[in-house]
Amino acid sequence: MSGRRQLNRRQQILEVLASELEKNLGLPITTSSLANAVGVSEAALYRHFASKAKMFEALISFTEESIFSLINKILDQEADVTVRCEKIIYLVLSFSERNPGITRIIIGDVLLGENERLHARVTQFFERIESQIRQILREANLSNGPRPISNIDAVADQIITYIEGKLSKFVKSSFSKKPTEHIEVQWSVMKAGYFR
C-alpha cells in the first residue's frame, strides 16, 4: 500500500506542478509555493523528487512517452505521407493545448536558470519529432504516393518550426491563442507547397 501511496503522491505533485505552471504564467514556481499548493511540506516534496529539476524532468518524460507512443500508432495506422504529417502536427499541438503548463516546459519558458540538462531534453524532444518527420518524408520518396517537392531536411525543418511557433504563441498569448486554431487551413497551404 505504501508504494501505491508514494506513486499517487508523486503523480499528485506533478499534476499540481503542471497546474501551477498554467495558473502562474510568467512567474517562477518555487518549491515552497509548490509544497503549499500540494498541501505538504517542502521536505515531503524532496522525499519524492530530489529537486525541482527532477520534477520538470518527470513531466518531460511523460510528454515524450505520450507523444511518441501516439506517433507510433499513427505510423501503424496511416500509410499516406500527408496524413501522417498532418496527424503528427495535430497530435503535438492538441497535446499542448490540453496541457498548457507542460507546454511552458517544452518550449523552455520556465527553464531559464534551470539545469542545462533540461534544456537539452526539450531540444532533443523536438529533434526526435523532426527526425521522425524526416524519416516519413524519406519513405514517401520511395513510394508511389505524394512526395516532398523540395529538400526533405528543409520540409522537416519547416514543419517543426511551425509546431514550435504555434506552441510559443500559445504561451505568449497567455494560452488564449489555441495551437490548433486554423490548423486545417494552414496545413492545406503547407501541404500544397510541400508535396506533389
Model-derived regions: residue spans:
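Hydrophobic alpha-helical connector segments
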Residues: 58, 73-98, 152-159
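Amphipathic alpha-helical segments used for helix-helix packing
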Residues: 97-117, 168
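Basic, helix-initiating cap at the start of DNA-binding domains
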Residues: 1-37, 54
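C-terminal peripheral helix-coil segments that are non-catalytic and often amphipathic
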Residues: 94, 98, 131-139, 157-162, ...
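Short hydrophobic/aromatic patch on the recognition helix
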Residues: 39-49
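Amphipathic alpha-helical segments enriched in hydrophobic/aromatic and basic residues
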Residues: 21-24, 30-31, 42, 52, ...
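Amphipathic alpha-helical packing segments from all-alpha helical-bundle domains
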Residues: 65-68, 72, 116-143, 153-157, ...
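Amphipathic alpha-helical linker/stalk segments
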Residues: 1, 61-87, 139-141
